[in-house]
Amino acid sequence: MYYTNKETFVLSADGCMDTERGGLESILAGNDEGAKGCCFSVAMSADGIAVLSSDGCAAAPDGTRLPVSDYSYAELHQAAPQLTPVSQAIELARTCQGKIAITVHDQTMLRQLRMTLRYADCLDDTIIIGLGLVEAARVASANPDLHIMGELPNLPSEIDALVNAAQTTGLFGLRA
């Protein structure tokens, strides 16, 4: 992904413009309003299927919240038919020709995401966010084909040292 500090691009957020969180509508709404890509969060089902989920849960029509990691994809889809596999979101984002920022909270899903992104030819247009600085650096070192951004809990006082450390570990960027 080509990026400089002079290039600005706006990504649509999950649930933007009063769309439902964890769905495809925010990708379309953002694209319609001129966003240059989209952001979404993923969670992994008990049988290893990555799905859109902003909080790690799937919402059943009756309002029940089901932890995604506790159920198989089939069980989740039966209880929450609107549940979206991440592959559908990636394909939609690809057709919108924008950048993708995927929030992951567990690095175990990176293997599946990498395969899905590579298959959709979106690997170079995707940033993985949501991992702490140390974990992100470790993941970036082991996965040089992924653009990993490290999360900072707060802005440190030694900015130059931090930027240098991020560059030497292979991080795509930092986010505070």
Locate each region found by the language model.
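Phosphate-group recognition and catalysis centered on beta-loop-alpha active-site segments
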Residues: M1-A176
